[in-house]
A protein has these predicted regions:
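Short, Lys/Arg-rich N-terminal segment immediately upstream of the first membrane anchor
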Residues: 1-8
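Hydrophobic membrane-insertion alpha-helices, especially the h-region
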Residues: 8-28
Length: 202
């Protein structure tokens, strides 16, 4: 093979290599974007399910906080209503916890921080409910302090806000986070610090 033909062959190989690299890079980029889209769509599906479950949880928790706890020992009816409402609250909280775990905070593009905060917030809410369940079981009685009542009402506000936001076809995650900020500050003492750490304290 002459030197001239060798140079032509080398140029052709280099051009082919560059072409393959460009095509492969575009393919990877398109696949990555597709994966991000799938991940975000799945997150919205989980959030929609959580919204439906949370709406029922909020209804039951509202019924629970309206019942006169002081009559639990003297009234079997009140005691039964407290038990039934809290049992459902606890079950729904566990269901929400499962769906919250499915939410992906990776491969969500520039919304990664928002999804992380939503997931963190839901875990903290469910942690409070689980803590109250453990307390009721340990004390074998429904004893709720004023601070705990305030947190229960905050839980109701959070799930009501999520349900309201999910009524729109296009969910604004930042608006959702703003709507649950105040009740989250009631539930989680470290929430303000968490917001500051991710630059969402405005």
């Amino acid at each position: 093979m002459s030197k001239r033909n060798l140079i032509k062959c080398m140029k052709w190989i280099i051009a082919l290599g560059i072409g393959v690299y460009i095509i492969y890079s575009l393919y990877i980029q398109l696949e990555y974007r597709h994966y991000i889209r799938q991940s975000i769509d799945r997150n919205y599906q989980m959030l929609s399910i959580i919204s439906d479950i949370g709406d029922n949880l909020a209804d039951r928790l509202s019924s629970f906080v309206e019942l006169p706890l002081e009559k639990a020992e003297s009234s079997e009816e009140v005691k039964e209503e407290l038990f039934t409402n809290w049992r459902i609250v606890n079950e729904e909280s566990r269901n929400i916890d499962n769906y919250t775990s499915i939410i992906s905070t990776m491969y969500t593009g520039d919304k990664e921080t928002d999804w992380s905060l939503i997931q963190y917030s839901l875990f903290r809410v469910n942690g409070f409910i689980q803590g109250m369940t453990d307390k009721f079981l340990e004390q074998q009685a429904y004893v709720v302090s004023d601070e705990e009542y305030e947190k229960m009402n905050a839980v109701i506000s959070i799930y009501r806000a999520i349900s309201e936001m999910l009524e729109d076809e296009s969910v604004d995650l930042e608006a959702l986070l703003k709507s649950i900020k105040e009740p989250m500050l009631v539930i989680d003492d470290l929430y303000q610090q968490t917001l500051e750490s991710v630059g969402k304290d405005d």
